[in-house]
């Protein structure tokens, strides 16, 4: 059975509280400025303690890119209910891209994205989902001289993720977001 979610809710939280959610938070704060004058603080502060007891798992692994002819780093967040043997349960996927000079762990360590996902899923604001943290090197996530990163993501990484994990393997089951260079890609 596939996870049911509204496209609006999934898009709102698509970047696990980063870019797109910042716009929503700031818009809400602008309507009620007395509540939160620094609506972007969550982007720059490491969240110390998760607000819920919900806990997904995170792994750092490699995928082989035929396009790039090399192994590439990625990290994955799996929801607490994830069972690789339960092919009937499919999850939407959030693809997250780091900024220039970084790597996929920046989205995890600097921004505490797994904690944000745990809080959003645990509170019911986001359906259970898989998050993939892409290492884009300094490619700006497009096909440039010497590194066809956009092609590698589209033709190699996404099919690899769909084959490896129980995903909603369609455009309706995917969203992509990032910060800085990752927002450009």
Enumerate the predicted regions with their spans.
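Secretory targeting signals
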Residues: 1-5, 19
């Amino acid at each position: 059975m596939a996870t049911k979610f509204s496209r609006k809710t999934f898009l709102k939280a698509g970047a696990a509280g980063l870019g797109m959610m910042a716009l929503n938070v700031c818009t809400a704060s602008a309507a009620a400025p007395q509540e939160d004058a620094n609506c972007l603080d969550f982007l720059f502060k490491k969240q110390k303690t998760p607000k819920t007891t919900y806990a997904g798992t995170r792994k750092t692994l490699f995928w082989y890119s035929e396009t790039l002819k090399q192994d590439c780093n990625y990290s994955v967040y799996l929801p607490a209910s994830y069972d690789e043997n339960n092919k009937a349960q499919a999850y939407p996927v959030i693809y997250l891209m780091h900024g220039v000079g970084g790597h996929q762990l920046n989205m995890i360590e600097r921004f505490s994205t797994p904690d944000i996902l745990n809080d959003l899923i645990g509170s019911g604001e986001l359906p259970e989902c898989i998050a993939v943290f892409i290492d884009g090197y300094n490619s700006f996530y497009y096909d440039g001289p010497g590194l066809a990163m956009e092609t590698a993501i589209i033709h190699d990484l996404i099919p690899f993720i769909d084959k490896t994990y129980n995903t909603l393997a369609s455009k309706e089951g995917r969203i992509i977001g990032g910060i800085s260079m990752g927002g450009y890609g």
